């Protein structure tokens, strides 16, 4: 499409959170601290699930992939957001905006499917424990992880290619802290009904379909747990699933508020706050949730840290 009598937009201005310099400095320090905790926590999970022999199971293999996804997911937005908070020119090029949007959709969709794979793993462990090691073999787990990562390719390519092909001929100020679909779409100078219908269909397929798989898995899990005669067994089963349920609730709860709410109910400020929840806060909380609620992870962290300290002291 061609912009008649107008120059096509070549860069966007990310308005971010505020124009107050003092507030920007405070936000920079706050988000830098969160990002540091996010990286340390998720890399710690990746490390202990890689080196600790007690964590060489399908559940921790998927947790390792989730932590890697969280690192990649935050890497797409947070560094640029931090730079913008201390920079007078909050500019992102047209290509840079498309690239950021592509990887945001890619890692977001991949996480949706990975969470559903983790739910299936818990379903097999609780509902079919005698055949768990046979069903959840190394080959299947590897393909499930690869499939989860690659599931983000179709939606990210489709959404980004279609969005970037639309004409941007007028204003270029994006009222957000990164190039998310809805705020960028507001700058398009033609009717976007077809794109919005396609975006909704993609959302239902790549977000709600994995969520439905999670619901089915946990429905079967809950039924199985309630049929257990042992109170200890029920408590252990619920404890095994609780961390994953909290993560799913945080991720899907906040993401659905952004992409499934009617436009008329969304102010730019509320959208930014909700977006912060699943792009910045949730990735920080995931390793904390899995670490604090899981004795095996806490034990592995202690063993790993102790071993590293002893190696530094030349004990080994």
From Swiss-Prot:
<feature type="topological domain" description="Extracellular">
    <location>
        <begin position="76"/>
        <end position="99"/>
    </location>
</feature>
<keyword id="KW-1003">Cell membrane</keyword>
<keyword id="KW-0325">Glycoprotein</keyword>
<feature type="topological domain" description="Extracellular">
    <location>
        <begin position="161"/>
        <end position="197"/>
    </location>
</feature>
<feature type="transmembrane region" description="Helical; Name=6">
    <location>
        <begin position="238"/>
        <end position="258"/>
    </location>
</feature>
<dbReference type="GO" id="GO:0004930">
    <property type="term" value="F:G protein-coupled receptor activity"/>
</dbReference>
<feature type="topological domain" description="Cytoplasmic">
    <location>
        <begin position="293"/>
        <end position="316"/>
    </location>
</feature>
<dbReference type="Pfam" id="PF13853">
    <property type="entry name" value="7tm_4"/>
</dbReference>
<feature type="transmembrane region" description="Helical; Name=3">
    <location>
        <begin position="100"/>
        <end position="120"/>
    </location>
</feature>
<keyword id="KW-0297">G-protein coupled receptor</keyword>
<feature type="topological domain" description="Cytoplasmic">
    <location>
        <begin position="47"/>
        <end position="54"/>
    </location>
</feature>
<dbReference type="InterPro" id="IPR000725">
    <property type="entry name" value="Olfact_rcpt"/>
</dbReference>
<comment type="similarity">
    <text>Belongs to the G-protein coupled receptor 1 family.</text>
</comment>
<feature type="glycosylation site" description="N-linked (GlcNAc...) asparagine">
    <location>
        <position position="5"/>
    </location>
</feature>
<feature type="topological domain" description="Extracellular">
    <location>
        <begin position="1"/>
        <end position="25"/>
    </location>
</feature>
<feature type="transmembrane region" description="Helical; Name=5">
    <location>
        <begin position="198"/>
        <end position="217"/>
    </location>
</feature>
<feature type="transmembrane region" description="Helical; Name=4">
    <location>
        <begin position="140"/>
        <end position="160"/>
    </location>
</feature>
<feature type="topological domain" description="Cytoplasmic">
    <location>
        <begin position="218"/>
        <end position="237"/>
    </location>
</feature>
<feature type="topological domain" description="Extracellular">
    <location>
        <begin position="259"/>
        <end position="271"/>
    </location>
</feature>
<keyword id="KW-0552">Olfaction</keyword>
<feature type="transmembrane region" description="Helical; Name=1">
    <location>
        <begin position="26"/>
        <end position="46"/>
    </location>
</feature>
<feature type="transmembrane region" description="Helical; Name=7">
    <location>
        <begin position="272"/>
        <end position="292"/>
    </location>
</feature>
<feature type="transmembrane region" description="Helical; Name=2">
    <location>
        <begin position="55"/>
        <end position="75"/>
    </location>
</feature>
<keyword id="KW-1133">Transmembrane helix</keyword>
<keyword id="KW-0675">Receptor</keyword>
<protein>
    <recommendedName>
        <fullName>Olfactory receptor 10A7</fullName>
    </recommendedName>
</protein>
<dbReference type="GO" id="GO:0004984">
    <property type="term" value="F:olfactory receptor activity"/>
</dbReference>
<feature type="topological domain" description="Cytoplasmic">
    <location>
        <begin position="121"/>
        <end position="139"/>
    </location>
</feature>
<comment type="function">
    <text>Odorant receptor.</text>
</comment>
<dbReference type="InterPro" id="IPR000276">
    <property type="entry name" value="GPCR_Rhodpsn"/>
</dbReference>
<dbReference type="GO" id="GO:0050911">
    <property type="term" value="P:detection of chemical stimulus involved in sensory perception of smell"/>
</dbReference>
<keyword id="KW-0807">Transducer</keyword>
<dbReference type="GO" id="GO:0005886">
    <property type="term" value="C:plasma membrane"/>
</dbReference>
<keyword id="KW-0472">Membrane</keyword>
<keyword id="KW-0716">Sensory transduction</keyword>
<dbReference type="InterPro" id="IPR017452">
    <property type="entry name" value="GPCR_Rhodpsn_7TM"/>
</dbReference>
<keyword id="KW-0812">Transmembrane</keyword>
């Amino acid at each position: 499409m061609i912009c008649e009598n107008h120059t096509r937009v070549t860069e966007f201005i990310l308005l971010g959170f505020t124009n107050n310099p003092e507030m920007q400095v405070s936000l920079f320090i706050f988000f830098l601290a969160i990002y540091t905790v996010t990286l340390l926590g998720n890399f710690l999970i990746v490390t202990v699930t890689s080196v600790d022999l007690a964590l060489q199971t399908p559940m921790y293999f998927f947790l390792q992939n989730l932590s890697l996804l969280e690192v990649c997911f935050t890497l797409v937005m947070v560094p640029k957001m931090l730079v913008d908070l201390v920079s007078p020119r909050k500019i992102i090029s047209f290509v840079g905006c498309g690239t950021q949007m592509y990887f945001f959709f890619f890692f977001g969709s991949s996480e949706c499917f990975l969470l559903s794979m983790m739910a299936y793993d818990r379903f097999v462990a609780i509902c079919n424990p005698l055949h768990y090691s046979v069903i959840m073999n190394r080959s299947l787990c590897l393909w499930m992880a690869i499939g989860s990562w690659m599931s983000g390719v179709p939606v990210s390519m489709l959404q980004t290619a279609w969005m970037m092909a639309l004409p941007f001929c007028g204003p270029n100020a994006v009222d957000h802290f990164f190039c998310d679909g809805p705020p960028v779409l507001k700058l398009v100078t033609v009717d976007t009904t077809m794109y919005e219908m396609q975006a909704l269909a993609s959302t239902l397929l790549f977000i709600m379909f994995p969520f439905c798989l999670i619901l089915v898995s946990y429905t079967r899990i809950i039924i199985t747990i309630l049929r257990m005669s042992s109170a200890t067994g029920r408590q252990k089963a619920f404890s095994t699933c609780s961390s994953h349920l909290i993560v799913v609730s945080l991720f899907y709860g906040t993401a659905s508020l952004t992409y499934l709410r009617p436009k008329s109910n969304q102010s730019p400020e509320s959208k930014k706050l909700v977006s912060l929840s699943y792009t910045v806060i949730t990735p920080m909380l995931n390793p904390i949730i899995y670490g604090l609620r899981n004795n095996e992870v806490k034990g592995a962290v202690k063993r790993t840290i102790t071993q590293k300290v002893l190696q530094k002291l030349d004990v080994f």
